[in-house]
Design a protein with these regions (language model features):
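Mature catalytic core of soluble alpha/beta enzymes
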Residues: 2-330
Length: 330
């Protein structure tokens, strides 16, 4: 091919200029708007279906995820059985359930809570009259009416509870009153004080006022032994919380539910029949050996001397010889 020969360009189709009609632009705008409206309606319907609450038995979640209601309790409720819609009933039950458990939990706590005169306040000011939260006053009233002095074994229970955070037997044994002499002597001394109303007693005074009366002998021993807690609810704590929440729900007319704590307390609020599973440890394995059926409003307690689930293990200690220590003093 000659250098001077010109390269042939491919033949291109001739360009044609087309003018768009301006007649249908308003119609197009209307169609686009209608399409957007239809899409918005479909999206809203989809969201409505997602947020729709179905009637029937459902777990009621706490409004606050960092709360006693979501960490230690389960509330199942028959939504829509009353006059309210399932969604409205779910919201009202959840708000009341969460609020009562939060307030009662703070009142019964042995940790300082800003602006709350709770159990911690009472323990830090023995022999003083203190106006406390109504929930704390009610808890001591319940124990007094029941003739229970379990709350006064708090120092012993506090030492015993330390056993369950241990990893090795050598650590655990120093908190075990059955295996360690010093721990046994401490437990015996605290038990003697706990049984004696002249040594320690919570007095119920008017206007939600409590006085934690502690004898001079007990105060001296507490100072020498590093005891700062004279009263605490221990394993009764969740029972008191469960009753407080259940009573509040019933008083507000919400009775279509069952409230239970993870450590074995339960309250049925209505006449529905419900079942309680019975477990037994056989040859190192956990087996469901039966079911107990109940009907009508009832309060139930189910304790186990062994861990049944992986999450249970933090509340028990198993020695290398196979002995299981449960969280209940006897």
């Amino acid at each position: 091919m000659s250098r001077k020969e010109r390269r042939k360009e491919p033949a291109l189709a001739p360009k044609e200029q087309v003018e768009l009609s301006q007649k249908n632009i308003p119609l197009r705008i209307v169609l686009v708007v209608l399409a957007l409206v239809a899409a918005a309606v479909c999206f809203a319907n989809a969201l409505g279906e997602m947020g729709k609450v179905q009637p029937g038995w459902q777990e009621i979640l706490a409004t606050n995820p960092i709360t006693a209601a979501s960490q230690n309790f389960v509330l199942t409720y028959n939504l829509g059985a009353g006059s309210l819609s399932p969604k409205a009933e779910q919201q009202k039950v959840s708000e009341l359930y969460t609020r009562v458990l939060d307030e009662t939990s703070q009142a019964l706590s042995n940790q300082a809570v800003s602006g709350v005169n709770n159990l911690h306040t009472l323990n830090r000011q023995p022999n003083a009259d203190i106006q406390v939260e109504p929930e704390l006053y009610e808890a001591f009233r319940v124990l007094e009416n029941a003739g229970s002095r379990m709350a006064y074994y708090a120092p012993m229970a506090e030492q015993y509870d330390a056993l369950f955070s241990c990893t090795y037997d050598e650590e655990a044994v120093q908190f075990d009153p059955q295996r360690d002499k010093a721990a046994g002597e401490f437990a015996a001394r605290i038990a003697a004080f706990a049984k004696d109303s002249a040594a320690v007693q919570v007095r119920l005074l008017p206007d939600n006022t409590l006085r934690l009366e502690v004898s001079q002998e007990y105060l001296d021993y507490a100072r020498e032994s590093g005891v700062e807690t004279f009263v605490d609810f221990g394993i009764l704590r969740n029972a008191l919380l469960c009753d407080a929440a259940a009573d509040a729900l019933v008083q507000a007319g919400y009775v279509q539910g069952v409230l239970s704590s993870l450590d074995g307390y339960a309250r049925s609020l209505n006449g529905e029949e419900f079942a309680l599973n019975i477990f037994e440890r056989q040859n190192g394995k956990i087996k469901n050996v039966g079911i107990v059926n109940y009907s009508g409003p009832a309060a139930l307690v189910s304790f186990r001397a062994f861990p049944a689930t992986e999450s249970d293990t933090v509340n028990y200690y198993t020695y290398s010889d196979g002995t299981v220590i449960c969280p209940y003093l006897n």
